[in-house]
Amino acid sequence: MNTQQLAKLRSIVPEMRRVRHIHFVGIGGAGMGGIAEVLANEGYQISGSDLAPNPVTQQLTSLGATIFFNHRPENVRDASVVVVSSAISADNPEIVAAHEARIPVIRRAEMLAELMRFRHGIAIAGTHGKTTTTAMVSSIYAEAGLDPTFVNGGLVKAAGVHARLGHSRYLIAEADESDASFLHLQPMVAIVTNIEADHMDTYHGDFENLKQTFINFLHNLPFYGRAVMCVDDPVIRELLPRVGRQTTTYGFSEDADVRVEDYQQIGPQGHFTLLRQGMPDLHVTLNAPGRHNALNAAAAVAVATEEGIDDDAILRALESFQGTGRRFDFLGEFPLEPVNGKAGTAMLVDDYGHHPTEVDATIKAARAGWPDKNLVMLFQPHRYTRTRDLYDDFANVLTQVDALLMLDVYPAGEAPTPGADSRSLCRTIRNRGKIDPILVSDPAQVATMLAPVLTGNDLILVQGAGNVGKIARYLSEIKLKPQIQEEEQHG
């Protein structure tokens, strides 16, 4: 939306003239930065604050946004509205100052809902797969020439950004259930990929509460809207009779409306057939590994088919799909020093998955595409509460790799929980007798501690949602070779 379109919107909604300056607290987060980017391109004055620069803040600065790397009351001066991340506490000085100045303070999802209000909204929700599915839907719509606006929680690699302003009526957005704020959204189409117990503090530890919240989200659809849901997921199958909207199901299940058949993986690509009711079968080559990504593609195809998008555009988009940042993100293949007299290489893959189901899917994709590789994982648990609540699941999943290095828990603001730390998890895994995990207390020592477990035919998965992605990039920069200065500093 350019300046002319912004003027048109303000003529439709005269009250929008009151909003000129939008301030974001926690602007460096992917979800926050994406919305800020769309609004900057719509012509609004954007400012924001965060603790440190990152690629998101750099992109926003290039668009003319003012970024403060501190949290001070004066940062919100002259703001028309303050948008706050769910990670920001109520006693943040900018939030306090905004309330004192009677500046409206809203959550990220409320602003996303305003962006969606006058567009054809497509919202992608679920415990796992949201970011990739959002990127797939966006890629198909772009390939079909529909020029969508999209707001994603991860980097869309084909576009090089988390969000992009299109000039059509379509807005494709990731919907976040972590704080239940997706209830603000009122889309025309909603995808639900799966529902598992996660972020249970938001739902007071009550899984029934979580399930009902997803139902409430789907009931934000108009009666003529459509819910696209993965029938392979047992919770979704259970909830389907309670969804009072038109539904399309997808999955490997025989009763799915859009059914995945004959899946096989060759290296990083999946090959499968999609069977659609009353439509020609689609023989898909998907440039993303794993059965879980075939499901994500089936969801995207279900939405695109309902919209009437040409099959050729769908197939082109999936075959050329470039993925999203930190979702089985291939960082390179690096030569290693000779091992047992033979030179070899190691592939390096960075992945955001931090729930046992996600980690399991990543491991399965790696095994399917590269069955002969020595599978090495560098894992960083994310949050003590998640590690505590899913402790046995983590222990079971992590024993599937050939070698495991584990960093300390990334706390994300939480206090340590006894028995839910990395040392305890390593001990539990070791006692099961399959692998002997290595605890890495000093991240600077990762390359040094990684070297002895490599065989010369390796696939290294760097796994987690904390700051482990920075370690993955560092390993790529040094080509997996331990640095002398590190050894001197920490030896």
UniProtKB/Swiss-Prot annotation:
It catalyses: UDP-N-acetyl-alpha-D-muramate + L-alanine + ATP = UDP-N-acetyl-alpha-D-muramoyl-L-alanine + ADP + phosphate + H(+). Its EC number is 6.3.2.8. Pathway: Cell wall biogenesis; peptidoglycan biosynthesis. ATP binds at residues 126-132. GO terms for biological process: cell division; cell wall organization; peptidoglycan biosynthetic process; regulation of cell shape. GO terms for molecular function: ATP binding; UDP-N-acetylmuramate-L-alanine ligase activity. The keyword Ligase applies. Its main location: cytoplasm. It is an enzyme of class 6 (ligase). It is found in: Cytoplasm. GO terms for cellular component: cytoplasm. Disulfide bonds: none annotated. Cell wall formation. This is UDP-N-acetylmuramate--L-alanine ligase. It comes from Salmonella gallinarum (strain 287/91 / NCTC 13346). The lineage of its organism: Bacteria, Pseudomonadati, Pseudomonadota, Gammaproteobacteria, Enterobacterales.
